[in-house]
Structure formats: C-alpha cells, structure tokens
Amino acid sequence: YEMLRSLVGSEMCIRDRAYAREDASSFIHKGVIYNIDKTAQALTSIINKLESQLNNSIAKVYVGIGGQSLRTVKNAVSRVLEEEGIISQELVDAISDENLEVPLMDMSVLDVAPQEYKIDNNLQADPVGVAGKRITGNFLNIVARASLKKNLEHSFEQAKVEIADLLIAPIALANAVLTESEMRSGCALVDFGADTTTVSVYKNNILRFLSVLPLGGNNITRDITALQMEEAEAEQLKLKYGDMLYEEEETETPAVCTLEDGRSIELNVLNDIIDARAEEILANVWN
C-alpha cells in the first residue's frame, strides 16, 4: 500500500529517533499526489505523531521527491571560442545555465548531473583551466512532471510545514547505501517499492541513468488475489511466505500455508506467482 512515512534522525546520520506513517493509498499513487487536501491532512497527522514521540516541535523537514514521471534526459551544450584560450569558470557556468533552458513539454528540471566536458577532442571531468577552442558540456537532467513538485510543495504549504530542502529520493538513497568504490567502478541500484521500481546507474562516481518503472510489490500482491482472497490477506501471505528463491523439497506432503477461511495453499503455488511477476519486473529493469 502507498504510505506517507517520516523518520527523524540525529547527528547527520541514520539514527532512528522517531517514526510515523499514514495510509495514503487513496490519494497518492505511484508516488504522485492526486489530492492535496488529504495529503496535507496526512502530513499534519504525521508531524503531530513525531512531535509527540520527540516531545519537541519540528521546524523544518527534508523531503524526498520521487514518482513515476521521474527520469533522466541527456543534453549537450556547445560553445566555440573566437580563438584558442583557457576555459574559465564563467564559461562553464554559462554553459550550465544554457542547459537549464532546454524546452521540456510539461516537465521541469529538478536537478542536473554534469557528465563530462569535451574540449576539442579530449574529455575532461573538470574543464576549468584547460586550453581549447571548442567546448561541449554533456549533462544528465533529472526531470519530472511539473505537477509532481508543485503538488508536493502545495501539500506541505497547506499543512503549514516548512521544507528545508527537496531531495531527489533515488539519489539520496544511493548516497546512503552505495560505497564510493561501487559508484566509481560502476553499478546499478534497484529500489523495489510498492507501486514503482527505481533504477539508478552510476559509473566513475557520476549518475549515468535514472528511471522509475510503474511496477512494484503491489503488482505481486494483486496477482496473489487470483487465489481468491482479499488484497490485505494476499499482502500478509506475500510478506510471511514469499520467497523468490524458494525450492520445493521432495516430500510426499508439500508445504502449505493456511488462509483465514481455512483453505490451504501450497507454498510452491504461491511462490510461482511471486516469481513470475518478479521476473517481469527484473526484465523491465534490464531493458
């Protein structure tokens, strides 16, 4: 189920001091806010719960932004100098500013991951101080539907909660769980969520690709309901017995789980359903 979650940490590290959540499945879907009023009410409830646990007031919050429309778009900006010279910081800043002017239909740039700069025929991570006549800046723009950020800000404003900073959730996650060595040598971080799966690719300590797929754990839950049960019970079975690496033991009596209505379901049947959908999600990740 879609949930609004909040965690209060301390001393600039992941240290749980307070935690609260609210069911948001009726007004947030695949990370997108569809009802600002209800979202604001849920935020107010979460803040009240956290302040009660902390016995203190919350002045500002850091907010992770994600959602189905979040993705990366490549862009390149070139400048040709009148004569060969030294690339200045001012020129690099001007190229970066021009990159933000790229027209995007119904989308907005949330952040930028500079890739490399090409000076004449040579690639440079830091072009300032390099001699050349032509410079091309390659950028990876992190974009999303303009309404994604707007609705998020409106919800917090209506809840009278001040945002200290908006963080790109997949990037914040990568910074928390990936090592510098992993980012440098190259890796993909796959975050399986309830309604979406996020893929982030890193190489040479730089984000190279980001995409949010509209598939997640809830798809598996809905598949399990085909065994004639409610979604809530399907979710419980998935969490308790689900195992994508499940291998049936060769016994006369197969392992089973018992449903609320007394029926029994073989674990291999349950896990075949889970495995089929998980394979589909992973196939989309690799593609």
Describe the residue ranges of each PLM region.
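A generic local structural motif
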Residues: Y1, L173-V177, N287
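Residue-level signature of catalytic and energy-coupling elements of molecular machines
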Residues: S6, V63, F156, D191, ...
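Glycine-rich phosphate-binding loop of actin/hexokinase-like ATP-binding domains
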Residues: S185-A226
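Conserved adenosine/adenylate-binding substructure
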Residues: D275-E279
